[in-house]
Regions:
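Short hydrophobic/aromatic patches at helix-to-coil boundaries
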Residues: 113-117
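Short alpha-helical catalytic segment bearing the HExxH-like zincin motif
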Residues: 91-99
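Active-site rim/adjacent substrate-binding subdomains
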Residues: 1-91, 103, 107-112
Length: 117
C-alpha cells in the first residue's frame, strides 16, 4: 500500500466516525510516519500506532493553550504484517480506533478486555 493510499484509508476511517465521537474530538492531530523513532518504540517491537497527549478525562480547567495531542500511525510496521489489502485496511482501522480510545481515556487493560488491544 503506497503512502497516499494509506493516508486515504486513515482519512476514510476518521470520516466514518460516529457524530458523538467527532463532536468530542478537539485539539488532536493524526500523523502518519513511516516508522516510529527509538523514543516511541524503544524495544523495536514494530509499534503500529501511538497516542501522545492528555486524554479527555484527564483534562482540567488548566488545559488551555497547549499543543495538540497526537495520534501517530506507522505505515511500515503495518506493511510488514504481510496482510492482504482488505485485512491490512482492517488492521489500520483497528489501530486508529485503538489510539482514539486512548484519547477518550480508555487504557490498554480495558481495550484488551473488549478485544481492541
Amino acid at each position: 500500500m503506497e503512502r497516499a493510499e494509506f493516508e486515504q484509508a486513515i482519512d476514510e476511517i476518521l470520516d466514518s466516525l460516529p457524530d458523538w465521537a467527532v463532536a468530542r474530538i478537539e485539539n488532536l492531530r493524526v500523523v502518519v510516519e513511516e516508522w516510529p523513532d527509538d523514543e516511541q518504540d524503544p524495544d523495536g517491537d514494530g509499534l503500529l500506532g501511538l497516542y501522545e497527549g492528555i486524554s479527555l478525562p484527564d483534562r482540567g480547567l488548566d488545559y488551555v493553550d497547549v499543543m495538540p495531542d497526537t495520534i501517530w500511525i506507522f505505515r511500515q510496521p503495518h506493511l510488514e504484517l504481510g496482510l492482504e489489502p482488505e485485512a491490512l485496511h482492517e488492521e489500520v482501522r483497528r489501530t486508529v480506533l485503538h489510539e482514539l480510545a486512548h484519547y477518550f481515556g480508555l487504557d490498554d487493560e480495558y481495550l484488551d478486555e473488549i478485544g481492541w488491544a
